[in-house]
UniProtKB/Swiss-Prot annotation:
Its cofactor is Mg(2+). The gene is TUBB1. Tubulin is the major constituent of microtubules, a cylinder consisting of laterally associated linear protofilaments composed of alpha- and beta-tubulin heterodimers. Microtubules grow by the addition of GTP-tubulin dimers to the microtubule end, where a stabilizing cap forms. Below the cap, tubulin dimers are in GDP-bound state, owing to GTPase activity of alpha-tubulin. Its main location: cytoplasm. This is Tubulin beta chain. Dimer of alpha and beta chains. A typical microtubule is a hollow water-filled tube with an outer diameter of 25 nm and an inner diameter of 15 nM. Alpha-beta heterodimers associate head-to-tail to form protofilaments running lengthwise along the microtubule wall with the beta-tubulin subunit facing the microtubule plus end conferring a structural polarity. Microtubules usually have 13 protofilaments but different protofilament numbers can be found in some organisms and specialized cells. The lineage of its organism: Eukaryota, Rhodophyta, Bangiophyceae, Bangiales, Bangiaceae. It comes from Porphyra purpurea. CDD domains: beta_tubulin.
C-alpha cells in the first residue's frame, strides 16, 4: 500500500498533528486506544496508509512526534488520544529552542536529529511501499522552523525519491507571536524551496477569519483552527485511503500542481464551511462546493487569489459525487474566470473523486491552488526581514549559535528570487514570452545552442 509517514515538529506542528490524528481516526473507526470499532469494511480497507497494524488488531499511527521541550508532547500523551501513539515515537529534548531558528537547526535540534531519524527510519522500514512524508510545523518559532527544516533536508538526503509535503504555518500579518518571526520564516523558506515537493501555506489569521466570519464562532480557539487544517489534510489523502472513481496520490498532486520546481507553495481551502445553525438551509451540490472552495474568503493563507493568477489548481471531492458534474464545474470555473488563470497552461484544474465522505458530511471538497498571489506572504515577511536585518537587530541570538550573516543574506535573496519568479510567470502571456521562457527555463546550454542543437551536433 502507499504508506505516508507523518512527522510533527514543535508546539504548533504537534497541536495540528494531534487534531489531524483525531479526525483521521474517526474516519477509519479507530478509537483512542487504537482498537477498531467502525461500521464499514471500507474503513479498514486501506487504513495502513496512515496506520500500522500492531498485535491484537491494534492500529498505531505512523507518526513521529518531535519537540525540543517536553511540555506539548506530555500534554498529548496525557490527553484523550495519548494511548493511540507508539510511546517510543515521542522524541523530546529538554532545553527548548526559544523561538530561535539557529538553535533548532544547528545546535539543540542537531543534537536530537539523529534519534528522530532513527524513529523515522524504523517507521519507513515498516512500510510496504512508502509513498512519502508529511510534516506539520510552523515557520515562526524555533523548533518547527529550525528543526523542522533540518529534518526535511536530512530525510530528503536519505529518501531522495519519496515525496515530501509540508503543512507550514506562516507568520500572520496582524497577529505576531514573536518579534523574530521574519528571520525564522525567511530562513525556513530558504530550506523549503530546495528540499520540499509541496508546501501547503496556512496562517492563523486567515483561519481566525474563517472561524469568526464563516463559522460564526465568537471566540475561535486553536482546536477550532486546527480542525480546519486537518479537514484539508484528510481530504488530500482521501483517495489513497478510500476507493474512488478518480484517484490521486502525493506524486500525482505534485506532477499536476508544480509547473516549475521552485514554485511549490500552495494555498489551501475546504468546503462546505457554514455556521452550525445554517447548515440545514444550504444545498450541498458540486456547484455549491466549487463556488465556496474557490472563494477568496475560504483560503487558509492570508493572500487574495484575485491579486494574482492561478498557475494550476486541484480539487478533491468526497462523497457520492458525479464525476461528469465535477468535470463540468472545473471547466466552468476556468471559462468563467479565465482572467484568473494563466493562459499558457490549458486545463489547469485537476479533480479527484473519492466515494467516502468525511464523518458527519454527505459531501465535501478540499482545494489546493498554486497561485502567484502567494507572493503576498513572501513580500510581507521579506519587508519585515529587511527592516530588521538592515539594523542587524536581534542578530546576535543567531550568530551566537554559530550562524553567519552570509546565511541571512542568501536566504533573503532566495526569497526575493522566488517572488520575482512568481511575478515573471504571472505577467507571461502565450505569444510574447515564448523565447524568454526558453531562456528562463535554462534551455540555453553553451553559448546559444539549445539542447536539440547540441544533440544534433
Amino acid at each position: 500500500m502507499r504508506e505516508i509517514v507523518h512527522i510533527q515538529a514543535g508546539q504548533c506542528g504537534n497541536q495540528i498533528g494531534a487534531k489531524f490524528w483525531e479526525v483521521i481516526s474517526e474516519e477509519h473507526g479507530i478509537d483512542s486506544s487504537g482498537a477498531y470499532n467502525g461500521t464499514s469494511d471500507l474503513q479498514l480497507d486501506r487504513a495502513e496508509v496512515y496506520y500500522n497494524e500492531g498485535s491484537g488488531g491494534r492500529y498505531v499511527p505512523r507518526a513521529v512526534l518531535v519537540d525540543l521541550e517536553p511540555g506539548v508532547l506530555d500534554t498529548i500523551k496525557a490527553g484523550p488520544h495519548g494511548g493511540l501513539y507508539r510511546p517510543d515515537n515521542f522524541v523530546a529534548g529538554q532545553s527548548g529552542a526559544g523561538n530561535n531558528w539557529a538553535k533548532g537547526h544547528y545546535t539543540e535540534g542537531a543534537e536530537l536529529v539523529d534519534s528522530v531519524l532513527d524513529v523515522v527510519r524504523r517507521e519507513a522500514e515498516g512500510c510496504d511501499c512508502l509513498q512519502g512524508f508529511q510534516v506539520t510545523h510552523s515557520l515562526g518559532g524555533g523548533t518547527g522552523s529550525g528543526m523542522g527544516t533540518l529534518l526535511v533536508s536530512k530525510i530528503r538526503e536519505e529518501f531522495p525519491d519519496r515525496m515530501m509535503c509540508t503543512y507550514s504555518v506562516m507568520p500572520s500579518p496582524k497577529v505576531s507571536d514573536t518579534v523574530v518571526e521574519p528571520y525564522n520564516c525567511t530562513l525556513s523558506v530558504h530550506q523549503l524551496v530546495e528540499n520540499a515537493d509541496a508546501v501547503f501555506c496556512i496562517d492563523n489569521e486567515a483561519l481566525y477569519n474563517i472561524c469568526y466570519n464563516t463559522l460564526k464562532k465568537p471566540e475561535p480557539a486553536y482546536p477550532d483552527l486546527n480542525k480546519l487544517v486537518s479537514g484539508v489534510m484528510s481530504g488530500i489523502t482521501s483517495s489513497l485511503r478510500f476507493p474512488g472513481q478518480l484517484n490521486s496520490d502525493l506524486r500525482k498532486l505534485a506532477v499536476n500542481l508544480v509547473p516549475f520546481p521552485r514554485l511549490h507553495f500552495f494555498m489551501i481551502g475546504y468546503a462546505p464551511l457554514s455556521a452550525d445553525g445554517v447548515t440545514a438551509y444550504r444545498a450541498k451540490t458540486v456547484a455549491d462546493l466549487t463556488k465556496q472552495m474557490f472563494d477568496p474568503k475560504n483560503m487558509m493563507a492570508d493572500c487574495d487569489p484575485r491579486n494574482g493568477r492561478y498557475l494550476t489548481a486541484s480539487a478533491y471531492f468526497r462523497g457520492h459525487v458525479s464525476t461528469k458534474e465535477v468535470e463540468e464545474q472545473m471547466d466552468a470555473i476556468q471559462t468563467k474566470n479565465s482572467g484568473q488563470f494563466i493562459d499558457w497552461i490549458p486545463n489547469a484544474i485537476k479533480a479527484s473523486v473519492c466515494d467516502v465522505a468525511p464523518t458527519g458530511e454527505t459531501m465535501s471538497a478540499a482545494f489546493i491552488g498554486n497561485s502567484t498571489a502567494i507572493q503576498d506572504i513572501f513580500k510581507r515577511v521579506g519587508s519585515h526581514f529587511s527592516a530588521m536585518f538592515k539594523r542587524k537587530a536581534f542578530l546576535h541570538w543567531y550568530t551566537g549559535e554559530g550562524m553567519d550573516e552570509m546565511e541571512f543574506t542568501e536566504a533573503e535573496s532566495n526569497m526575493n528570487d522566488l517572488v520575482s519568479e512568481l511575478q515573471q510567470y504571472e505577467a507571461a502571456t502565450v505569444e510574447g514570452e515564448e523565447e524568454e521562457d526558453a531562456y528562463a527555463e535554462g534551455a540555453v546550454v553553451n553559448g546559444d545552442q539549445s539542447y536539440e542543437d547540441q544533440y544534433a551536433a
